[in-house]
Amino acid sequence: MLLNGQISALSLDDNDNGQQHQDEVQAKHQDQGHTCPSRPSVPSLSRIYRCTPVPTIVLDASMVIIEVSNSHVALFGKPRDSLLHTSISDVSPECIPVPNIPILYGALRAACSTREIQVVEHVVVGEKIAHNLRVTPVYEDETLLFVVLEVENLRAEVINNQHAYMNETYKILVDTVKDYAIFMLDPTGHIATWNAGAGVLKGYKAEEIIGKHFSILYSPADRDNGKPARALDVCLREGRIEDEGWRYRRDGSRFWANVLITPIYQFGQHVGFVKVTRDLTERKEAEACMIAAFEESSRLKTDFLANISHEIRTPMNGMQIALTMLTDTGLSEEQREHANIVQDSMSLLLQIVNDVLDYSKLSSGSFSLHADMLDIREIVGAVVRNCRSSLQEGVELDTEISPKLPTRMRGDPLRYRQVLQNLVGNAVKFTEKGSIHVKITSSTDEEDSDSSVVRTEVTDTGIGVPDSAINTLFTPFSRFANSAARKYQGTGLGLSICKSLAELMDGSVGYSPNPNASGSVFWFTAKMGGRSVTPPSKSPSVSGSPVPTEVASEMRSIAPRKHVLLVEDNIVNHTVMLKLLHTIGFQRIDGAWNGAEAVRMVRQKPLSYDIILMDVSMPVLDGLAATEQIRDMGLTMPIIAITGNAMKGDAETYIAQGMDDCICKPVHRDQLLRVLWKWFGT
């Protein structure tokens, strides 16, 4: 009997064997007046089954083999004595034959439960000859006497007749498809069939390729690292595998292929794989062209913006330095007012240039933060001091900083200041009376207890935001305040940049109306680390608060002892930079008009110069090449890049290639003082 999927002895009504039960049944029939025909003795049955031309195994009710035919021994080559008195579950499936023992269990279970013949079809035996296994239960009344397993040889024409329609349909389908290579592999990966599409795509004729391993279609590198074999392993494990990659034709040319491999099973037995390949070379080339076009477009845009930045900043540099020196002279009130107008206009122009560059970097995804230690209180103080001069008469600007705010945190000080400066600057611009209040609070980050979330609110009593503009406040190029009259100048990029920067700092930005008066509340959050970090040994200097008076005084005493080499090709910038350095206190300043001249001067006096201020973009020899040649001399004096290039990564590139610091044009006196103090004062 089959219990829980296992073969066990079948119940014989508590008798020891089928013969005893047979005798009882015969006696019962005689007692009832029936005549029971005599049955052949076991030896007679044994001779019948042993001599039958059909390969046969006879099982008793306990599923133990009690007879094996000569024809079975001849077909399978298994000695009779090795099979007799053996449980059928201990016999190799190939000698029964069945694909596997579970299939045999199923057939025996079905035969014994239904008392009907069961057939396991198309079992491959020997030289790929298909057979059927007939499972016949022999019952007398309710008692199972025997189970007969017979192997039927299926002639080729019978199989062909059974599958003629399917084969013909498949053949027509596969052979007429020329856009796809469709072929079969045997279980070891050797090619078994080859359609017309495969011939067109791969260049092999059927007689040239059938029988060869499919790895011939892969590159030598793929064959060496075992990619074909791994593909079949994954296919068997996961049920299919799809891949894209280079495949090779007979003539050695390659094409970009999409490959799908599926395992083929027959009656639970793995018999091979079907492989479908299509040529995606045109799509791959189109994708490559699109990527190249996108990269070229991005490069051209980057180059254009870099050029625009350089071309605008270079003349602005001369204007800025000349204006700085002009304001140090004895100007009348009217002249000073005119100078302030020029200064304000230059600041606005520079802000527009910076906004366009920042927006370009943010929209392209090429913007990144620079983590460093920062002091929020110091940054807020610097921004407030910077904005006080622009306040309308009577407008108050105050701050409220939570005492729980950590003194030192880790973040990007430049970008935090940029967002804060923008929000406070907007409040100053749009508030004509009343007050502006800056509030800073912090809380522990819920996901990282070592970090803090800093919330910055700027509340004003200005003109407020109309309801129609609320949904587009943080959209690029959106301007709502008196746009027709253009009373308030700007690009409409500021708040959009603030939003992007806040999100880069793992925060957000938002707006709400002032709950206590007319005006607005703009806020942003930023995640700040709490643990200290070691700043890089070299990093580009950034503008900050005004240089203290004592620093300028100290520099004035240090400068006369220092020898400076100024390398600048623009005559205006060269002239005003020389004058600016003189106003700081430097007396020994040499000038070079290009990198080649600078290298020559350094080579003549290698130990003379204490610092080199080097323009980057120059004729004959640019600043980076000149720096490389100076470093090759073994000289380590500070080389400061003075550049109109302000794209993301420019300063880091200059430092990586041997320079020590970077100042972007237009050069402000305080910015130059800060850098010089960094290298001389400490």
UniProtKB/Swiss-Prot annotation:
Signal peptide segment: none
> What compartments host this protein?
Cytoplasm
Instruction: List the Gene3D superfamilies hit by this protein, alphabetically.
Output: 1.10.287.130, 3.40.50.2300, Histidine kinase-like ATPase, C-terminal domain (3.30.565.10), PAS domain (3.30.450.20)
Q: Which PROSITE patterns match?
A: HIS_KIN (PS50109), PAC (PS50113), PAS (PS50112), RESPONSE_REGULATORY (PS50110)
- Record keywords, A-Z: ATP-binding, Conidiation, Cytoplasm, Kinase, Nucleotide-binding, Phosphoprotein, Repeat, Sporulation, Transferase, Two-component regulatory system
Q: Which organism is it from?
A: Emericella nidulans (strain FGSC A4 / ATCC 38163 / CBS 112.46 / NRRL 194 / M139)
Q: Which residues form the Histidine kinase domain?
A: 307-530
What are the protein's GO molecular function terms? ATP binding; phosphorelay response regulator activity; phosphorelay sensor kinase activity; protein histidine kinase activity
Q: Which residues carry this modification: 4-aspartylphosphate?
A: 615
Q: Which InterPro entries match?
A: CheY-like_superfamily (IPR011006), HATPase_C_sf (IPR036890), His_kinase_dom (IPR005467), HisK_dim/P_dom (IPR003661), HisK_dim/P_sf (IPR036097), PAC (IPR001610), PAS (IPR000014), PAS-assoc_C (IPR000700)
Question: Where is the PAS domain positioned along the sequence?
Answer: 45-105, 166-239
Cellular component, GO annotation: cytoplasm
What sort of enzyme, by top EC class, is this? transferase
Query: Function, please?
Result: May be part of a two-component regulatory system required for formation of conidia on certain growth media.
Its post-translational modification remark reads: Activation probably requires a transfer of a phosphate group between a His in the histidine kinase domain and an Asp of the response regulatory domain.
Q: Phosphohistidine occurs at which residues?
A: 310
Q: Which reaction does it catalyse?
A: ATP + protein L-histidine = ADP + protein N-phospho-L-histidine
Please give the name of this protein. Answer: Two-component system protein A
